A protein has these predicted regions:
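Alpha-helix boundary/capping motif
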Residues: 6-7
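ATP-dependent carboxylate/acyl-activation modules
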Residues: 44-241, 246-327
Length: 327
């Protein structure tokens, strides 16, 4: 079942085989090439986690109580407002891998939250998705912690090969999707939404049972997936990724982390989303080029490429690398 070419019926649930190539089934920002992100960012607009969770909450998808903070004092005020004696402090950048890079800290007490906020704000966080220069941290998300019993992976995205909106799910939550695909390809579940009828409740239930959820949790997952599909369609999104989707000690489902990408081509009718764009996360050269309507991707090599298509660009870079160059 090669996910790049398989044209199975939209209503069927199927598993990715161990031999399948996962590239076209992965969320766009997850695909990398020689350490450089290969997604075409000039057609995608990333949101910060706190912005993504606000959208999820708007569409009835459970998220932990939390608020953004732009200074150390504001972080402490948010902690007081949330209450409790423990919090999670999350650096807000447009890249994954924050936890492994020290960008997510669990703290107890006001002195600890002050120290954590001070250590993150004003720095540049380097993860496996940012490149060596990292990305600036000028805002934080302060949340109440949750007691997690199990973590799952759930994403809604456009599969270009199938030309359909698809959902990808896995029991191996909390891991990068590339890692899941490499280590547990048989644990990745995929359902395809019909372009006319949309995602169906029975498909959501099938995913829930495949994940091993209990009856009430299956019902909750169905409601959550249908709400995600509604959000995805109503806001012209390219990706909604929840990793992890957690089962709490009360057997509730909650989105512990969220990533949302918006299709730039739809921003003319999504003005509210356009205003959420944080240009500080853009590469300065890419941002300048975008002002002139140019698609420019900054790389670390010494050979520039001027090409007239994404496919030709990737092939050209492959040839340059093959002959010892650095695009």
């Amino acid at each position: 079942s090669h996910c790049a070419t398989n044209k199975r019926a939209p209503g069927r649930i199927w598993y990715i085989s161990r031999q399948a190539k996962m590239t076209t089934c992965l969320p766009p920002a997850s695909r990398e090439r020689d350490g450089v992100r290969a997604n075409n960012n000039d057609t995608l607009m990333n949101l910060h986690e706190y912005q993504a969770k606000a959208l999820l909450a708007e569409f009835g998808i459970p998220v932990p109580p939390g608020k953004p903070a732009f200074s150390v004092n504001e972080a402490m005020e948010v902690a007081d407002e949330l209450g409790g004696g423990a919090w999670v402090v999350k650096a807000q950048i447009h890249a994954g891998g924050r936890g492994k890079a020290g960008g997510v800290k669990k703290v107890i007490g006001h002195s600890a939250i002050e120290k954590a906020a001070d250590s993150l704000l004003g720095t540049r966080l380097v993860t496996h998705q940012t490149g060596p220069g990292g990305q600036p941290v000028d805002r934080l998300l302060i949340e109440q912690p949750c007691v997690v019993m199990h973590e799952y992976y759930l994403a809604c995205l456009v599969d270009r090969a199938l030309e359909r909106v698809v959902f990808i799910a896995s029991r191996a939550g909390g891991m990068d999707i590339e890692e899941i695909a490499a280590r547990h390809p048989d644990k990745i579940i995929k359902v395809v939404a019909d372009p006319i009828a949309g995602l169906q409740a029975y498909q959501c239930r099938e995913v829930g049972f495949a994940l091993g959820l209990k009856d009430k949790q299956v019902t909750a997952l169905s409601r959550l997936m249908l709400n995600i599909f509604h959000l995805f369609s109503a806001r012209d999104l390219s990706l909604v990724e929840i990793n992890p989707l957690a089962v709490t000690s009360g057997s509730d489902l909650i989105a512990l982390d969220a990533k949302i990408q918006v299709d730039d081509n739809a921003l003319f009718r999504q003005k509210a989303l356009e205003e959420l764009h944080d240009s500080s996360q853009d590469d300065p050269k890419e941002h300048k080029a975008r002002e002139f309507g140019l698609s420019y991707v900054a790389l670390d090599g010494n050979i520039g490429c001027m090409v007239n298509g994404a496919g030709l660009a990737m092939a050209t870079m492959d040839l340059i690398k093959l002959h010892g160059g650095a695009p």
